Swiss-Prot record:
Cofactor(s) it depends on: Zn(2+)
Catalytic site positions: 99, 273
Gene giving rise to this polypeptide: qtrt1
Protein name as annotated: Queuine tRNA-ribosyltransferase catalytic subunit 1
Any single Pfam family the record assigns to this protein: TGT
Its membrane topology: Peripheral membrane protein
Similarity section: Belongs to the queuine tRNA-ribosyltransferase family.
Reactions catalysed: guanosine(34) in tRNA + queuine = queuosine(34) in tRNA + guanine
Positions contributing to queuine binding: 99-103, 153, 196, 223
PANTHER family given in the database record: QUEUINE TRNA-RIBOSYLTRANSFERASE CATALYTIC SUBUNIT 1
List of residues binding Zn(2+): 311, 313, 316, 341
A GO-annotated cellular component: mitochondrial outer membrane
Organism: Xenopus laevis
InterPro entries associated with the record: TGT, TGT-like_sf, tRNA_ribo_trans-like
Amino acid sequence: MAATKSHALVHRVLAECPVTKARACELQMPHGQVKTPVFMPVGTQGTMKGVTADQLRNLGCEICLGNTYHLGMRPGPEIMKKASGLHGFMNWDRNLLTDSGGFQMVSLVELSKVTEEGVQFRSPYDGKEILLTPEKSIEIQNALGSDIMMQLDDVVSSTISGPRVEEAMHRSIRWLDRCIAANGNPDRQNLFAIIQGGLDAELRKQCLQEMTKRDVPGFAIGGLSGGEEKDHFWRMVTLSTDHLPRDKPRYLMGVGYATDLVVCVALGCDMFDCVFPTRTARFGSALVPWGSLQLKSKQFAKDFQPIDKNCDCPTCQRYSRSYINALFKSDTAAMHHITIHNIAYQLNLMRSVRESILQGRFPQFVQDFMKTMYGNKDKYPQWAVAALETVGITLQ
């Protein structure tokens, strides 16, 4: 398959599913190779909560996320430069993606005001007024030295409709141009555009049309997984992948539930991130192919099996459900063990998805995955059934 060299990224499409829009690709970046489809664990302040860089490496993680909003506040760009960027700071020699800080605007909306210039908000650390402009976002990300940087976009909640959505879409295009102009390191850092337009098909198409004219190395599908109905969600995903170029990576932001990952690979997405596996671990929830186990529950007090006997992660190799259940009463190590397992689960799921695409059996993989996850066809989520139907998979 032909490789496309764009900026600091070489993108190869290795295999495409003849039935669905799923594909297996390879990205070559400054810190090595990333095989897609891929799930990227999220470390808000340069660390995965409860997991070290070494442990991530040992799980075979090729790329993870850092958060510009938090790292730009503390410890700040000056310290980052002295530490040789985020890679040096967190002792991580593989690829890093940093977000622009835009998403935090929605979650901390009481702190922020959006104008054409940028986003104004009070620092949650010291209460100072800060203006995050597209230029400032790129300046911070250049200091962080991430392999993939995200443009600053004007983020509105996916449940909002009306003129604000259109305004945000047009502004995101203008801000993309400002981010491209501000990138002081295009031969080492890849700047991805973010497709906006809410749940409005026409606005999404307009945004796709404009942004795909820009010479950027990759595209993200933004403004989704913010509480909108799943039926709207998958339609916007497939609309986006229909209009995105084949020769560039497609990153669906904020998606991490196993079913969503599998369905969205079928719809043509390559990269995913979400805090879900690490956040849910803190509440004692371990991810398994048939759903999840609530390990705090007393039903596991005398259960001496591993979380999942087919999982090769350090937690499943060493500890029982009973042991982790007991730890929860006294020790934060329980969360640590489940976090390791949950990240391993996500990474392994995506490896299996990828293998099935390379071997030409992805549609069968999807059938088996759904059967294992839900058991009975009556329990399949209707949105997933409908979405898969549009790409040639009729669930049995």
